[in-house]
Design a protein with these regions (language model features):
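General beta-strand structural signal in soluble alpha/beta enzymes
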Residues: 25-30, 52-58, 124-127, 177-178, ...
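Glycine-rich phosphate/diphosphate-binding loop of Rossmann-like nucleotide-binding domains
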Residues: 58-62, 66-73, 77-172
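Flexible, glycine/charged-enriched surface loops at secondary-structure junctions
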Residues: 21-30, 54-56, 90-98, 272-284, ...
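Glycine/serine-rich phosphate-binding loop and adjoining beta1-alpha1 elements at the start
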Residues: 1-94
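Rossmann-like adenosine-cofactor binding region
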Residues: 130-221
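Adenosine-phosphate binding glycine-rich loop
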Residues: 86, 193-310
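Short glycine/serine/threonine-rich phosphate/pyrophosphate-binding segments
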Residues: 107-111, 183-185, 206-208, 229-231
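A glycine-rich phosphate-binding loop feature that marks nucleotide/adenosyl-phosphate handling sites
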Residues: 29-39, 59-62, 96-108, 129, ...
Length: 311
């Protein structure tokens, strides 16, 4: 699809959905196959329908149109923060940790770059064309440059031995980050996973059937709703900035998003230890508990407790 065709499709979709979208209703944001350009078209078409500029109707926009600094790398940064938080709890030194990342799009490439900057050794990366392994560490900067100069593909990257995606998933590493598609880890390959820690950069990369297999093997898995929440968090920051008419610095965005993810991880980890359950189940409990307490306050059946200040 050409750029002009994609723009016409995006604008037609917005025309059909403009009553559903809104800065206080449903707010679209980028995901696979979309980015700042599509968000700009959507915002522009929505604004035309409303007769005024409404930049808070979407997030992930170009910065010149009200986008937030730190949004592009936000999901990958959240994966990095979650990974380091988990390694700390597991008493694994990041400077001695090996990492394999399946998927080298926005999330995977940023996670690789940020983890390498913090001392981890990224030994394997992959995309849809296959993977590359280097026991001494992939040169992440060169891999990103190669991808950018090769239409977004890692194909023919010279920085490591060629491997398959399945080989990457079953490598003996400290950290495995599935950052591609859903149902990457299933009951068919879960028994072959050798990583000590899985951090879900993608949405739903582990099937329901694979979860108990990983648990039985003692593999810690940071669930997607926690690990890749950085993008949603900074999207919220962008919306706040649009509504207030303020611009935050990159350091402020990083500091606030990192703090939220660390606090959420520590809360989920504490619940998992208290009840001897997986981090995924603990994350669901934390989320449901917060919603439940909110409803009980609203209907008058609950009274304020001191620990609610930290929730």
């Amino acid at each position: 699809m050409s750029q002009s065709e994609l723009e016409r499709l995006t604008r037609a979709y917005t025309q059909a959905m403009h009553d559903v979208f809104g800065p206080d209703k449903d707010i679209p944001a980028p995901d696979m196959g979309t980015g700042p350009n599509q968000m700009a078209w959507l915002m522009d078409e929505y604004s035309r329908a409303k007769g005024t500029t409404v930049n808070a109707v979407v997030t992930g926009k170009p910065i010149i149109l009200g986008g937030s600094v730190g949004r592009i790398e936000a999901t990958g940064r959240g994966v990095m923060v979650s990974t380091l938080s988990a390694l700390t709890k597991m008493k694994i030194n990041p400077f001695k940790a090996t990492v394999a990342i399946q998927g080298f799009g926005n999330v995977g490439s940023w996670a690789a770059q940020l983890l390498k900057e913090r001392g981890c050794t990224v030994v394997a990366i992959s995309d849809v064309t296959g993977g590359y392994f280097n026991k001494d560490g992939i040169d992440v900067g060169k891999a990103i440059t190669h991808k950018n100069e090769n239409n977004g593909s890692l194909e023919n990257f010279k920085g490591g031995k060629k491997i398959s995606n399945e080989e990457l998933l079953t490598m003996e590493v400290d950290v495995l980050i599935p950052a591609a598609l859903e149902n990457t880890i299933t009951e068919k390959n879960a028994n072959k996973i050798k990583a000590k820690l899985i951090v879900e950069g993608a949405n739903g990369p582990t099937s329901h059937e694979a979860d108990p297999i990983l648990e039985k093997k003692g593999i810690v898995a940071v669930p997607d709703i926690l690990a890749n929440a950085g993008g949603v968090i900074v999207s919220y920051f962008e919306w706040v900035q649009n509504r207030l008419g303020f611009k935050w610095t990159k350091n402020r965005v990083y500091r606030r998003s990192d703090s939220i993810i660390k606090q959420a991880f520590n809360n989920v980890f504490a619940i998992s230890r208290k009840y001897n359950i997986s981090l995924r189940t603990a994350a669901y409990i934390a989320a449901i508990d917060k919603v439940s307490r909110t409803y009980r306050y609203r209907d008058g059946s609950f009274t304020f407790q001191k620990n609610d200040e930290d929730s």
